[in-house]
């Protein structure tokens, strides 16, 4: 006899009629026929069955909270389902960490959330954004969350690991480590940024070198300009201290002007000689008066054309004085060339004038004179010389105006 089966007490048999009075104790009978049937055939009895999934554990709270977080349409600007509804995307990790994680979890660390996804087998779909997917994490199919299992990790190296099936191994091979994959992408991005920064640094260094060289050239030019300015101021100060300097320049200028006038007169003599020849030829031939008159008119026109407008091309007295100061030694050689051009009966007289002019220039304005004049004024103080410079300018202006009036 099976001890699990017991007699069932029949409290309300079929023949018992309802009555307002409670039944007596003798009315409770045991059905012997039912007991015998249960003993003979136990399958005829119906056992109470548990509800489906009663002994199964539900999905982990992490997956449930994550699903509710993604399903909420009010936070689609931060996290939402993808277009294919088989993955979810975190659009704003900063806002996700600050606002949503503390609401559903006990932390606000986005990296911890990603590591937790990794332990449940989520994979990162797109390396350029935070998009995660799992075969059991689908939109509108929350009941599939129970199929997602947490990976078992053992810290004890001596613990025996259970062998996995070929299917599970293939799934693990295709599964991407989410946290590590994200770190690799960030490292690649940092390497690219480093390379770009290195190229920019090299370009800036080259630009700095070129700018430094340019500034060095500018400084050298500025120093040369300042030295020339100091020499000019020293020269002007020295000229103001030497009252005979201006007088010597004026006398030298007058002598040069006399020599130029003498040279211009001597150049006109061949033209005058030709005129006399025409007149003589006219006297001998008998009809030369008309020819002489016409030739004299032509000669006068040519002289007027040649020498009449020389004043337009003459330099001002101040310009000549400046040129004379800058290159007085070169003027003597130029004068020699001009004087050597003159040929004729007066060649000896011109050479004597040239030698006297050259001798006077060497005596008065030799190389030693200019060198001493510049060297003596190198350390001169220019603070109180503004009045002397103004006087020099007035004297130079007086010389220019007097030359034009003459």
Curated annotation (Swiss-Prot):
Domains (record comment): The hydrophobic-rich region (HR-A/B) corresponds to the oligomerization domain. AHA motif is a transcriptional activator element.
Modification after translation, per record: Exhibits temperature-dependent phosphorylation.
Position of sequence motif AHA: 367-376
Subunit structure: Homotrimer.
Sequence motif: Nuclear export signal, positions: 392-399
Motif Bipartite nuclear localization signal location, chain numbering: 253-269
Localization (cell): Cytoplasm; Nucleus
UniProt KW keywords: Activator, Cytoplasm, DNA-binding, Nucleus, Phosphoprotein, Stress response, Transcription, Transcription regulation
PANTHER family, per database record: HEAT SHOCK TRANSCRIPTION FACTOR, HEAT STRESS TRANSCRIPTION FACTOR A-6B
Species of origin: Arabidopsis thaliana (Mouse-ear cress)
GO cellular component: cytoplasm; nucleus
DNA-binding region extent: 59-153
Biased composition (Basic and acidic residues): 266-279
Main location: cytoplasm
Family: Belongs to the HSF family. Class A subfamily.
Family matches, as Pfam families: HSF_DNA-bind
Region Hydrophobic repeat HR-A/B: start-end pairs: 174-240
Stored SMART domains: HSF (SM00415)
Taxonomy of the source species: Eukaryota, Viridiplantae, Streptophyta, Embryophyta, Tracheophyta
Name of the protein in its database record: Heat stress transcription factor A-6b
Region (Disordered): 266-287
Function as written in the Swiss-Prot or TrEMBL entry: Transcriptional activator that specifically binds DNA sequence 5'-AGAAnnTTCT-3' known as heat shock promoter elements (HSE).
GO molecular function: DNA-binding transcription factor activity; transcription cis-regulatory region binding
